[in-house]
C-alpha cells in the first residue's frame, strides 16, 4: 500500500476577533533522516506548534518511511488536529507539515495542506507559504490539457505543473515549474524518499535550514529549530532549491537571478520575536523600529504600553529611546487566538473586550503612548483607545511601527482589497480623528529602512505601490480559483 490518508472529520471552529493586523498565509516545516526508527511525525508536530502563529485555520502533515506515505490533516489548531494516537500511526523518517491561513481559496478541508498527488515520480506532497498572482491562467492551461482539480488553492496548480514534467528528474521538474510561477512561494515538497525546499527568486517569504544530529530540518522560521533542539544552519537563498535524500544535501538554483524582496511584514508582525530572518533577529528589529518611532514622536507622555503581543518589542525600544517608562497596560486573554485569523467578517465583530483587558492602575490619569504594529481597517484601534479612556487614561497617543498601508498585497497577505485599507482613502489626521487618538504617529518608510536593511532587499509594496513581482491588472481576489 503506497498511501493511507488518516482523516478523522472532527471539525473545530475557532472564534477570534476583529483586528487591524494583516494576516499571514501559512507556515511550512519539513524533516529528513536516514534512521529507520526516526519519529518524523512527532518532530513535525512540535515544529508546527512553533509555527502556529502563521496560520490557525487548518493543519496537516505527510510522512514516509521510505516506502509508504501516510497523511493526516484537518481544520483547526495543531492541538485539535493531532493527538498521540494519530502521531503514533504516522510512522516515518521523512515528513512535511503545514499550518494554513487562506489567501487563495476558502477555508475548507479540501484546501488544507499538504496537498498530495500521484504522478510518474510516485506520490508527491507539497506545502506552500505564499500566494501566486497568475494562478487562473496556469490553471486554465492545465485544465485544457486534462488536469482535474479537487481544491481551489493555488498550491494544487503548483503540484499539477510539477506532475506535467514527467520526463524530467524531480529537481528539474520543480525548477521548470518555478520558472512559470509569478508571485510568492516558499515550498516544502516530499516524495517517499526525498525532502525538498524551494524559495522563490525574490525571497519574498522566509525559509531556512537546520540540523538535528544527522537529520535535516526545513522551516518557515528558525524559532521551530529551537523548539525541537535543532541548530540553525542558514537561510535558504532566494531562487534556491535544496534536495535531501540518501546521497545527502544538494542545492540547485533558478537560472535567472531576481532582486531580493523579502516581505517587510515578516519583521513588523508575522514572525515570532525569537526567529532570525535573513540574518536579522526579529525582536531586535522591532526594538529598532521603536527607537525610530520615538525620534518621530513629538508629544509628552507618562507611560508607554504595547498592544500585546507584537507591539511589545517595539514598545521596549520606544521606551529605551524616549526615556518614557514602559509598562503593561493591556492584558491579553491567553485562551483567545491571534487576531484576524478567521477571515469571515461575522467572526470579527465580537468586540475587543474578550481579548484585551486594561490595567486601570497603570492607566488612570496618565498620558499614554500605545504601540501597535499596524492599522489596516482602523476598527480595533478605535476600540482599544476607547477602552484605555474608560480605564482612566488622560490622553492616548497611538504610535504605529508600520507606515500607512495604502496598497493591497497580492503575495500572501490577506489585504488584497484596496477599499478595506483605511489609509488608501484617508489622511493621517482623518484616521486619528476616526480612532479618536490624541495623536497618531506612523513610522516613516525611511525610518523602517534604518531599522532593518537596505530598501533594495525589502518588499514594501503595501506602503509605496512598488510591486517587485508584476501583478496582472493589479487585482487580487482570494476566491479567484472558485469563480467562473
What are these language model-derived features?
Residues 178, 193-194, 229-235, 386-484:
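PRPP-dependent phosphoribosyltransferase catalytic core
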Residues 176, 224, 231, 239-240, ...:
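Phosphate/diphosphate-binding loops
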Residues 2-238, 243-301, 307, 395:
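Conserved short alpha-helical segments that host acidic/polar catalytic motifs at enzyme active sites
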Amino acid at each position: 500500500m503506497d498511501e493511507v490518508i488518516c482523516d478523522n472529520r472532527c471539525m473545530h471552529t475557532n472564534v477570534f476577533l476583529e483586528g487591524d493586523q494583516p494576516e499571514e498565509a501559512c507556515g511550512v516545516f519539513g524533516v529528513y533522516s536516514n534512521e529507520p526508527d526516526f519519529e518524523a511525525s512527532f518532530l513535525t508536530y512540535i515544529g508546527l506548534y512553533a509555527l502556529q502563529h502563521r496560520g490557525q485555520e487548518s493543519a496537516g502533515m505527510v510522512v514516509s518511511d521510505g516506502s509508504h506515505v501516510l497523511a493526516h490533516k484537518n481544520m483547526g489548531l495543531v492541538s485539535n488536529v493531532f493527538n498521540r494516537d494519530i502521531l503514533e500511526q504516522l510512522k516515518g523518517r521523512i515528513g512535511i507539515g503545514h499550518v494554513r491561513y487562506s489567501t487563495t481559496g476558502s477555508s475548507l478541508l479540501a484546501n488544507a495542506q499538504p496537498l498530495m498527488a500521484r504522478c510518474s515520480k510516485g506520490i508527491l506532497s507539497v506545502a506552500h507559504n505564499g500566494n501566486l498572482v497568475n494562478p487562473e491562467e496556469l490553471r486554465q492551461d492545465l485544465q485544457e490539457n486534462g488536469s482535474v482539480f479537487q481544491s481551489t488553492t493555488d498550491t494544487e496548480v503548483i503540484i499539477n505543473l510539477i506532475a506535467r514534467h514527467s520526463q524530467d528528474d524531480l529537481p528539474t521538474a520543480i525548477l521548470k515549474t518555478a520558472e512559470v510561477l509569478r508571485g510568492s512561494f516558499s515550498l516544502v515538497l516530499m516524495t517517499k524518499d526525498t525532502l525538498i525546499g524551494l524559495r522563490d527568486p525574490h525571497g519574498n517569504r522566509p525559509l531556512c535550514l537546520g540540523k538535528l544530529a544527522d537529520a535535516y530540518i526545513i522551516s518557515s522560521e528558525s524559532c521551530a529549530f529551537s523548539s525541537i533542539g535543532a541548530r540553525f544552519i542558514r537561510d535558504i537563498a532566494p531562487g534556491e532549491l535544496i534536495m535531501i535524500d540518501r546521497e545527502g544535501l544538494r542545492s540547485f538554483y533558478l537560472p535567472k537571478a531576481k532582486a531580493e524582496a523579502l516581505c517587510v511584514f515578516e519583521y513588523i508582525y508575522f514572525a515570532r520575536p525569537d526567529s532570525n530572518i535573513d540574518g536579522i533577529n526579529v525582536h531586535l528589529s522591532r526594538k529598532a523600529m521603536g527607537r525610530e518611532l520615538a525620534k518621530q514622536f513629538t508629544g509628552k507622555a507618562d507611560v508607554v504600553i504595547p498592544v500585546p503581543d507584537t507591539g511589545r518589542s517595539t514598545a521596549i525600544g520606544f521606551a529605551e529611546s524616549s526615556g518614557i517608562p514602559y509598562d503593561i497596560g493591556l492584558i491579553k486573554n491567553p485562551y483567545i487566538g491571534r487576531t484576524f485569523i478567521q477571515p469571515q467578517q461575522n467572526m470579527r465583530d465580537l468586540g475587543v473586550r474578550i481579548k484585551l483587558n486594561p490595567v486601570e492602575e497603570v492607566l488612570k490619569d496618565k498620558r499614554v503612548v500605545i504601540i501597535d504594529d499596524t492599522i489596516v481597517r482602523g476598527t480595533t484601534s478605535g476600540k482599544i483607545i476607547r477602552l484605555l479612556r474608560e480605564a482612566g487614561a488622560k490622553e492616548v497617543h497611538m504610535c504605529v511601527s508600520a507606515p500607512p498601508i495604502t496598497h493591497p498585497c497580492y503575495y500572501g497577505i490577506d489585504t488584497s482589497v484596496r477599499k478595506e485599507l483605511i489609509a488608501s482613502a484617508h489622511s493621517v489626521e482623518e484616521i486619528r480623528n476616526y480612532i479618536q487618538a490624541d495623536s497618531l504617529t506612523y513610522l516613516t518608510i525611511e525610518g523602517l529602512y534604518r531599522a532593518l536593511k537596505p530598501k533594495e532587499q525589502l518588499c514594501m509594496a503595501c506602503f509605496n505601490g512598488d510591486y517587485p513581482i508584476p501583478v496582472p491588472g493589479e487585482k487580487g481576489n482570494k476566491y479567484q480559483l472558485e469563480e467562473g
